[in-house]
């Protein structure tokens, strides 16, 4: 057992865990913190496997915590990146309607974004948005100038550096899984640590960590995997920045879109398929406990029953490059199979 007692222990070394650690350490420099990350490096799961988009706050219900946190978080994130010379670009994005039904939803999306405090939103005709993205087709688009791209893994590691530079007594421990905790003792794969307080930032295992702490939740995490293709070197010129479809309001997914990464690559995706392993990143990834827990949850069954057709289409696209391409061609008709 470690003899030292820490003021706060944070479980989870993704961007949420390290942002929490950084803010606490910045505001209370004398606090002794310890961060536990079960993988060998920080930002290994969701933080390091997303498309790197800085979302503006366009989609979320006005007045919700999601809307408020997205807008304020974006401002803080950009400020931090600028102050620390980190790689980011507020390049803006267009949301493209491909038919009249989507055009009406796009009008409402603009109103929603303005109510959330976004500035510079502008509806564009095809002639106008093709000056931004010449290869994109559609009936109307929404210009969102406050969206951008960033390296979230780099941000997370910079948070870690800042924590250690403010207080050298604070620790960030990787390859260290939290097994159990009781009162002020935390049992890990690297021994027992003592802490006055514990903050859980456990990503896809947040619900299980809460259950260990005897928190009764009505909700449960159900894993969905998103797969991406990359545009070929030759096809990269067909996209300048970020191009999104108008999202279907029935689902929490934004649809297959195009994203320029900070390294210049162009990603196309993702789809959204139920995964049989929470932290599974391949089509064959499987974990019995994760699968049984997800399928026994009433929310999962309700989702499958109500939206089986959507789910089936996503799985078909998951195993068919031609179907994936067909979805991408709705916005960029000139794309061909060899482009992805």
Stretches found by the model and what they are:
Residues 142-197, 201-208:
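Helical element adjacent to the flavin cofactor pocket in flavoenzyme catalytic cores
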Residues 2-16, 34:
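Beta1/beta-strand and adjacent pyrophosphate-binding region of the FAD-binding site
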Residues 43-73, 82-88, 274-310:
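Glycine-rich active-site loop/strand segments that organize a redox cofactor
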Residues 52-128, 138, 255-256, 277:
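Dinucleotide-binding Rossmann-like beta1-alpha1 core, especially the glycine-rich loop
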Residues 216-218, 235-236, 261-340:
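Flavin-binding catalytic cores
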Residues 19, 181, 188-287:
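Flavin-dependent oxidoreductases
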Residues 25-49:
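Glycine-rich FAD pyrophosphate-binding loop
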Residues 61-72, 96-106, 142-161, 313-323:
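Short beta-strand to alpha-helix junction loop
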